[in-house]
From Swiss-Prot:
Family to which this protein belongs: Belongs to the methyltransferase superfamily. L-isoaspartyl/D-aspartyl protein methyltransferase family.
Organism: Dictyoglomus thermophilum (strain ATCC 35947 / DSM 3960 / H-6-12)
Active site: 68
Any one of the GO BP annotations: protein modification process
Keywords noted in UniProt: Cytoplasm, Methyltransferase, S-adenosyl-L-methionine, Transferase
Location(s), subcellular: Cytoplasm
Protein name: Protein-L-isoaspartate O-methyltransferase
Length: 220
């Protein structure tokens, strides 16, 4: 897909600088860096924050939600170890930026968002950009999307106090889940690998996400 009509030389220059920052911070996957270099993050940011589109920081997108810091997007995506043929479940569509990164790197993306307005806005952005491998659902992300399970990869972009049971069930044997786990104010990002009935955790570092709300998440 050619995004030139949505871009400017200034934005492209800022993306290149951002990619260099991400490299310096330890992101190694060239595929992930290429996706960040390609995708116009400014299209996913509210008008009042346009000047900050390519800063390495999270930004508000309304409804108490945020578009994640680019480093965290890159870290989570890199941790999924996508080869290009995966079916991915994303919990928390948000602005749709992480969704677009995933759509560049995997075969099919199934994304669930509980806030209707955010889902509709993300859907419009991704359609305008030409992505036709993304499927959207309005609902409780802690329940996953059972209809299309199992998934090769699951990415959760909100913080849970534990792994929601439905997501464990919907992850394919041998699959990978990336999820922030902890309290409301601070969590650790984990890469979870499923092997039979066992789930092996690898700690990727401290993070701060908005709470994952739903039947198997925070209740308020």
């Amino acid at each position: 897909m050619d995004f030139k009509k949505f871009d400017t030389p200034e934005y492209e220059h800022k993306r290149r600088k951002l990619v260099e920052i991400l490299k310096d911070e330890g992101i190694k996957s060239q595929k992930v860096l290429n996706a960040i270099l390609k995708i116009p993050r400014h299209m996913f940011v509210p008008q009042e924050y346009l000047s900050l589109s390519y800063e390495n920081e999270a930004l508000p997108i309304g409804y108490g939600q945020t578009i994640s810091q680019p480093y965290i997007v890159a870290l989570m995506t890199e941790a999924l170890n996508l080869q290009g043929n995966e079916k991915v479940l994303e919990i928390g569509t948000g602005s749709g930026y992480q969704t677009a990164i995933l759509a560049e790197l995997a075969l099919e993306i199934y994304t669930v968002e509980r806030i209707k307005e955010l889902l509709e806005e993300a859907k419009k952005r991704l359609r305008v950009l030409g992505y036709n491998n993304v499927y959207f659902k309005l609902g409780d992300g802690t329940l996953g999307w059972e209809e299309f399970a199992p998934y090769d990869r699951i990415i959760v972009t909100a913080a849970s106090y534990d792994i929601p049971e439905p997501l464990k069930e919907q992850l394919k044997d041998g699959g990978i889940m990336v999820i922030p786990i902890g309290g409301r104010d601070f969590q650790y990002l984990y890469r979870i690998t499923k092997k039979g009935d066992n789930f092996y955790r690898e700690n990727l570092g401290g993070v701060r996400f908005v709470p994952l709300k739903g039947e198997y998440g925070w209740k308020d």
